[in-house]
Amino acid sequence: ATDELQRGGVLPGRIRRDGKPMILLITSRRRGRWIVPKGWPMEGRSLVGAASREAFEEAGIVGDIGPTPMIEYRYMKVLDDGSQVPCRVTVFGMNVRGTLSHWREKAQRQRRWFSLDAAADRLDDEELAAFVRTLDATPARLKPTEGWTRLKRSSGERLEGTR
């Protein structure tokens, strides 16, 4: 549909030392639902650019982002005035290398690591939840490969656990 609004998002993941894949989710600001970081592309920015910016601002995470979408899904976004608009979210894989202890939306959101099943159970969107469950068979999709872009953090930001 041409009246759909486009958003870019990330599915932030990492593989633990024991080989278990984990997904990072954040809460939505208004209703506190567990979601993936996503946002509107700014003028002249790509969907992957919007996705990486939102990962940094909404979740306080840095890492490597994949060049090709992992999944697209649709949902109805409730606007501040209560009206709803159809949105299509293009989700890129992100291998999380670090979490910031201070980030722009820290006071407005929670951020938590989940196993794939636990993440899927908490996600409202059925399509995205079903996709997250499939990652169990191919957790390597959460690892950066050739073509992934290393996201830089701004100077002055400190990663948790670093001095």
Please annotate each region the language model reported.
Residues 123-163:
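Charged phosphate-binding loop/patch that engages nucleotide di/tri-phosphates or the phosphate backbone
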Residues 1-36:
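N-terminal strand-loop-strand
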Residues 6, 22, 85-92, 110:
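Short beta-strand micro-motifs in enzyme catalytic cores
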Residues 1-5, 45-49, 57, 72-76, ...:
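Polybasic/polar functional segments that serve as interface/processing modules
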Residues 36-70:
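The catalytic Nudix box helix
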Residues 90-134:
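NUDIX/MutT-family hydrolases
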Residues 56, 60-100:
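Active-site segment of metal-dependent pyrophosphate-handling enzymes
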Residues 35, 86, 113:
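Short aromatic/basic micro-patch
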